[in-house]
């Protein structure tokens, strides 16, 4: 659940934007943002001419070990963008980081909204079979689906426990 790394970075930016605490962002905040950005840069894998983030578990615990989870990829990009902005604004002299961050932002592949207006949760989600969930909706919040299917089986279906892309739209409305 590496998305937590970007979630913390997002919270740091929110704190700074809300409080205007320049001392915090120039010291502790920048240190945290740089290290979390370095983590994302190291997590990316090259696939042909682009970078991708593989083998992740986004906030939706029913979809595990997937590639290019939309929530994770967008939050990772935001983390690296903000770290780069803060580094430039507060005079970070780590030229190697700046170069790596620029390349990451240029080459990271981002899941795109489909013609039907849907942002796929990950590379495989839309190809998975959908099942009728009416039986389980009456017992909402109880995970009764796990009485009929194993977690591994649920992982291979179009089923959400937490709607990653809905939360993504809240956290990064732009």
Identify the meaning behind each predicted range.
Residues 15, 58, 173-174:
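Short, glycine-/Ser/Thr-/acidic-enriched flexible segments
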Residues 27, 81, 85-88, 92, ...:
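Active-site core of glycosidic bond-cleaving carbohydrate-active enzymes
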Residues 1-45, 72-73, 80-83, 87:
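Aromatic-rich carbohydrate-recognition surfaces in CAZymes
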